Design a protein with these regions (language model features):
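Sec-dependent signal peptide recognition
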Residues: 1-2
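C-terminal motif of bacterial Sec signal peptides marking the signal peptidase cleavage site
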Residues: 7-9
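Accessory beta-strand-rich segments of carbohydrate-active enzymes
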Residues: 14-32, 72-200, 226-228, 241-243
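Predominantly extracellular/luminal regions of secreted and cell-surface proteins
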Residues: 25-53, 184
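Surface-exposed, low-complexity/disordered Ser/Thr/Gly/Pro/Asn-rich loops and linkers
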Residues: 57-68
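Short, solvent-exposed beta-strand/turn "edge" segments of beta-rich domains on protein surfaces
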Residues: 67-72, 209-213
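Beta-strand-rich binding/interaction modules
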Residues: 106-108, 215-248
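Surface beta-strand/loop "capping" patches
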Residues: 195-228
Length: 248
């Protein structure tokens, strides 16, 4: 079964959401060394350092022990991007981060935009007033130990499993019986600009009502960026059949 959902505007046929992925022109450098290297987004610092032959493959031999300095360093990712007027003229523009690992400070055109502390969640920031045709973004990642040691010092008891429990990120990066200690950082999911007028679809989820061998019944729940908007409709296509739901 295929499902497609489209938001349309009755008063205008120009109600389209534009998405611009920011995956190009990235570099990475240590905060203590201004030498920069090409970086991949999505990706992580260990992969970028390997690609630039700064470190050896940590999964080979005992190389794991030679690269522990990576997780103790501050890493800065930078990029520039251009936006056309078709994006800049939209009423609403957000900068979206689907995954930053983990303690990051984000600057857009020199302005502090966001601080993150959770690699599992996404972040969305309104940025229309900060954007121009030519833009620069910078993301600085701090070592997790900076925050973990502080959190540990504030407790009167010793917690099991060491520092890992204080940080919301993939726990296997701290080492496991099947894998090395590679506490990485970086932009591990998509970064993108989202621009729209009036309203846009925020997220969609299905709610099952019941099913038999012959058929199933479920609700399609659609959350909008502006749920109070009227004069629009939700078009849902399921298995080739279209349904129109008016927003009122």
């Amino acid at each position: 079964m295929g499902l497609a959902v489209l938001l349309t505007a009755c008063q205008s046929k120009q109600q389209h959401t534009l998405v611009v992925k920011l995956h190009e022109n990235w570099t990475v450098s240590s905060a203590h060394d201004k030498q920069s290297y090409p970086a991949s987004v999505p990706g992580n610092i260990y992969s970028d350092l390997m690609d630039n032959e700064i470190i050896e493959d940590p999964f080979v031999g005992e190389n794991e022990h030679k690269v522990q300095w990576v997780s103790d360093s501050v890493w800065v990712y930078k990029s520039t991007f251009t936006l056309p007027n078709t994006v800049l003229d939209k009423q609403h523009i957000t900068l979206n981060f689907d995954g930053l690992d983990t303690y990051a400070t984000v600057l857009l055109n020199g302005e502090a935009l966001l601080n993150t502390n959770n690699a599992f969640r996404n972040y969305t920031v309104q940025v229309k007033d900060l954007l121009t045709a030519e833009n620069a973004i910078e993301i600085q990642f701090e070592p997790t130990s900076t925050y973990e040691n502080k959190a540990k010092a504030e407790l009167d008891v010793t917690m099991p499993e060491g520092n890992r429990i204080f940080t919301r990120k993939a726990q296997f990066q701290y080492g496991w019986d099947w894998g090395p200690v590679l506490n990485t950082s970086g932009i591990w999911k998509d970064i993108y600009i989202k621009a729209w007028d009036v309203a846009a679809i925020d997220h969609i989820y299905l709610e099952e009502n019941g099913y038999t061998v012959e058929e199933a019944s479920f609700n399609v729940n659609v959350a909008l960026t502006n749920p109070a908007v009227v004069g629009n409709s939700i078009e849902v296509e399921v298995a080739g059949k279209r349904f129109i739901i008016e927003v009122n």
